[in-house]
Amino acid sequence: DVVKVVVAVGVVSCFDLEASIWAGFAAAFGHCYPVFAGFRGGKAVATMFGFLLSTSIFTFQSAWYLIVPFAVFLVVLYAGKMVSLSSMCAALTSSIYITVMQLHISVEIVAASWLLTILVIYRHRANIVKIKNGTENKISWL
């Protein structure tokens, strides 16, 4: 899941950096709604990680675009023990960080980032209900 986004962003970034962001979003969207699996796919968390990894390398050339959301993921996971909540917080953090750092450069990059965050949160809507009801699964190994 991570690799498909890294490859998409990496290849397209050779030609157009802004288009590489959309290639990453398209790969994540395709992961969530695969044609050959009846449009039933994942929750875009692994592909979001691939998006952040690949854009950190190819588009932004700064590891901070990956480190900041990953640090938030780890802190929220340690505090709340819920992977779903941690994933959504990391997605929000990534878009906020990209907005702060890139808005003056490219609205397209910011828009693609927010669309990916919305996709991640939308795919976790059942988990949001469980969190509200106090029935979301928690990890026990941390």
Model-identified regions with their sequence ranges:
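Interfacial segments of multi-pass membrane proteins
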Residues: 12-16, 26, 30, 45-80, ...
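Glycine-rich phosphate/pyrophosphate-binding loop and the adjoining helix
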Residues: 103-112, 120-130
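Membrane-embedded alpha-helical segments of multi-pass transporters/permeases
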Residues: 9, 36, 95, 99, ...
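Interhelical loop and helix-boundary elements at the membrane-water interface
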Residues: 2-6, 31-47, 76-90, 123-142
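Multi-pass membrane catalytic core of lipid/isoprenoid biosynthesis enzymes
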Residues: 1-13, 23, 68
